[in-house]
Amino acid sequence: MAKKPVQFTLNGSEKATFVEEGQNLLDVLRRGVGDLTPKYGCAQGTCGACTVLIDGEPHLSCLTLAETVEGRSVATVAGLENGAALHPLQEAFMRNFAAQCGYCTPGMLMAAKALLERNPRPTREEVVEAISGNICRCTGYEAIIAAILEAAGSGSAASKGRG
Amino acid sequence: MPVHVETHANISDAARALSSARDGRFFGGGTLLMRALNEADQSIGTIVRCTDPVLRQVRSEGDRIAIGAGVTMAEIMANRDLAFLAPVARIIGGPAVRSAATVGGNLFAEPPYGDFTTALLALDASVRFAGESGQSTPLQDFLRDRANRRGRVVESVMVPRITDPKALRFVKVTRVKPKGAALMSIAAWLPGSGGRGCRIAYGNMAPTPVRAAAAERALEGASLSEQGIARALQAATEGLTPPTDMFASEWYRREVAPVHLKRLLLGQGQ
Amino acid sequence: MSIEFRKELFADERDDNLNEIGKPTQRQDMVGHVTGRSPFYDDHLFEGLLHMRCVRSPHHHARIRSIDVSAAASMPGVKRVVLGKDVPRNLNTLLSLLDFGLDDEPLISERKVSYKGEPVAVVIAESEHAARDAVAKVRVDWEVLPHVLDVEEAIVPNAPTVNETYPGNCFIYHGKYTHQKLRYGDVDAAFAQADHVIEGRYQMSPIEQAPTETCGAIAAPENNNRYVCYTSTQALFFSLGTAAKLLDVASNRLHFIGGTVGGGFGGKVDSLHEPMAILGSMLTGRPCKYMFDRAEEMQVGAPRGAERWYVTDGVMNDGRLVARKFVGYFDSGAYTRLSSYAIIKAVGHLPGPYTIPNVYADVYCVFTNRTPATAMRGFGITGVDFAIEAHMDKVAEQIGMDPIEFRILNSYRDGDMKAHRRLAKNTALIECCQVAAEKAKWSLSDQAKRQNSLTGGGGERAQLPNFTKTDENGRVEGFSTGSYAQKNKPGAPAQPPQPNYQPQPAPRPSAPPPAPPTAPPPQTPAAPPPIPRPTTQVQDPFSAPTPTPPNPPQPPAAPPGGAPRRTTRFSSISGLRRR
C-alpha cells in the first residue's frame, strides 16, 4: 500500500510521519507517532474516546483521514499539562472524581477544552451539549459535568496548555 | 482492497476523477466514509477529495442561498444568514461530528442519519452538481434516485432565504438523551399564515427523507390550532410504509408520528 | 452529589467509627486517568505487531462443509490463516476451572457453528486492514441448519440440538436434572388454600455491557520460552487458566499483565482473546493483537443473557404471601459460559427478600442459537429481581393493597427462615421501604411506619416446613452426580444420590425409572412421583397439605421498646462466611 508523508504539529511539536492511504488519524497518533492518549472505542464516530483538537476544533480522530492534518495543529491530552502542573480541567476532574475506568477521560477532557476555549463561562446545558458526543459507560456524567463547570469557574481553564 | 486517495484542487477535476474512478467515492467530511474505510468496506477502491474553495462558500443568489456542499454543521451554526438552520445543525451528532460533517455528505446519509436533509426537503431545497451553473435538481427528485448520484460531485444546495426563524420547525425523536440516532425526524416549513403552503418532511420513515404529502394537503388553508390540524394528523403517515428496524417498529412509528407532528405544528415543547 | 446517612437506624449496632465512608479519598489511578497515561492493554507498543481478525459465521446454525483459505493466505501482508485444527485443545468451558460444567465450546469452530458470529478461521496479517481484506476472501461452504432462538422452543422434543455436549439443550445440574430445583414446603397445597393465586410472566432481553474499550489482548514471545499477554480481562486468573488449558501449556509459561480495564461490567470475565492472541504469537513467533471492533463487541461479545420468568403467588386477603412458585429460563446462548452458575445464584436468592413459607423453583439454563451469555452486574439476580418486584406490584394491585405496605408486611425480618434454609439476619428491607416512601412523599399507615426488621421475626417464622414435597422431574441419565454436570467417566462409578435435606422424615419419592440397558439417551424425563402424604404431626399447618386453612407467617407484632442488640450488621458481603 502506498504511503504518504504528512507533517503536522502535535501539542506544539513538529511531527513528520508516513501514513497509509485511507488510514485514520487515531491510528497514526497512536502507532505512528506514539501518542497513546486518544483511545479506540468504536472507529465509527459514536463514542468520542478518540476526540482531539485540530486547529482548536474538536474532531474524532477515528473519522479523520490522517493525510488531511497536513500542516495543521493537533492537540491531545498529552499536551494538557504545563510542565509538572496539571491543567485546571485535569485538576477539576481529579477533585470531582470524574473518572472511573478512565477510558473515556481523554476524550472528555478534549471535548471540555474545546468548549472552554470558545466559551469560557458555559452554562450547565452548554456543558452537557459539549460532551454529548462522548460516552461514559461507568455512568459518571454528573461528576464530569461538575468538573467542567468547576474548571470554568476557575476562569483559567481555557488558556492553559500547549498546542 | 488497498484504497487509493486522490485530492483535487479544482471541482471539475474532482468530478472528472470521480466519474472515471473504479469503485470511487467522494469524500465530504468523512463521518460516514471513514467508518466504511475503518471497516475495510470492500466496495471502495478510490477516494476522491476536493479542496476547491467553492465547496466551502455560502452565498446569496436572489431569494435563495447557495450552501457549498463542503460546509460543515459547525459552520452552519456560526453563519448568521443560516440562523434558521442552526437548530437543525445543532442536533447532528456531538460537536466533534459537527466540525467534520458536511451538508453534501448528509444528502447521501443512509438511515438512521440524514436529519439535515430532512429539513432541506421541507425547505424545497435543490441540488446543484459540479459543472452546472444555472440549473439545479429538486431535492425530492435527487432523493428518489439517490443511489445513482453517488458518481457525481455535489457543488451546493440551494435553500430559500428565511428571515423568520419560527417558519422552520424541526424535531428529532430519539430514545437516548441528549443525543442519539433518530427513530424519526420531522421538519415543517410554514411559509405563510397558518398551514398555507406548508411543507412537511420525515426522516427515517422510508429509505430516504420523504414528504408527508397527505398531511400537507390537509393543512392547506387550515389554521394551526388543535382543530385545524386534526385532519392532517389523521393523514400523518398516509401513503408511507415506515420501516421496522432496531430503533422502532413500523407500528410504533405510525403511532407516534401524529403525536410529534401535533406538537411540532402547535409549537409545543418537545 | 451528597450522601445521606440514616444513622438513627440500627444505631446501637455500630460503633460508628467510619474512617473512610463519607470522606473522599483520592484514587491511586486518578492521575493516570486524567493525563491519559493509565496503561490499558492496547497502550503497549510492539515492533512488528501482527493483527488477528476472525472469519465469522453469517448463520445462526450451520455445518461447515469446507473452508477454503487459499486466496486469503496468499494476499499481501497475510502471515497465516489459523483454523480449529491449529488449537492444541479446542474445547473448553470457563467454569471447568471450578469443576462446574462440561467442555462445550471450541475456540475456533471446526465442524459446525451454533450462533451468528461464531469464529471459524482467523487471519493473522501485518495490518488490521490487510487482515480484514483477507477475511473477506475466505470461502466457507455452509450447510445451513434449522435454528432455535427461543428458550421454551429450544427444550421441546425434536428441537434442533444447539450444543452437542448437552443434546437436550439444557445444562445438567448436579449430573441429574435438566434444571436447578428449589423445594421448600408445598406450594400446590398452599395455592389450593390461598384466597388468590396470581400469575405473571416476565422477560428480559440480552443486554450488552458495551464497555468503551472493546475486549482484546496482545501477546508476544518472551524469554525462557514464555509468552507475555497484555489483556483487558476482568478475571486475570480465569483467563490464564483458560489460555493454559486451550493451548495445552503449563500456566507458568504464560505471563499475564492486566488490571487496567476500560470498563468491563461483567463482559470481560470470560473473554477468549488471550488464548487467541497467544496462539497467534506461538504460530508466527511475532507479537499478535486480537481485539473486537465495536460491531463485534455488540454482536459476539457475550451479553447478559435473556431471562424469562413465570411467577405464581398464593396470597391471602390480608396480603400475606403463602406460596410463591417460579419457573425460569436463562438463555445461555450457544454455549455454557457463566449462565449455569448464574442460575445457582438466582435460585439461592429466591423468593427475594420476603418471608414466604412455601417456595418452589425450576430454573433451566437453556442453549439457543444466540450469542453465548455471560456475567453482567449483579448477574443471576437482576433479572429475577425485576420479575419479583414487578410481580409484587401486580399482586398488590390485584388484592387492592398499597404496594409498599404489601412489601413491608411480607418483608423478611431478623430470625426468619429463608427458602435456602438459613435464618435471615441483618435484614433491612422494612427500613428501606419506609425511607423510600418518606423520600417519595408516599403516605404509609401508622401500622406500616411502626414496623421494623428487628422485631416480629423468628419464633414460628424461624421454623422449617414440616413437609417439603420433592420430585424427580427432569431426571436424566448418563451424567455423573459427582459434580454439577459431569458425564460418567469409565472407572468413576456414579455416586448415590444425596439425600434430600428434610427437617423431618417424609416419604421418599419414588425412584426414577431405570436407565436403558444400552448407551442411554441423554435425557429421560421421569413421570412425576405420586404426591407424598405426610405421616407426622405437623406443627406448622401452613406448610402441610392438610385441609385446615393455611396459616401464613405470624403477622409481626408491633415493636417493643427497642431492645438493644450488639450484633454486627453487614458483616458479610458475599454470605460465604456463614457456610
Where do the model's predicted regions map?
Chain B
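C-terminal structural segment of proteins
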Residues: M1-Q270
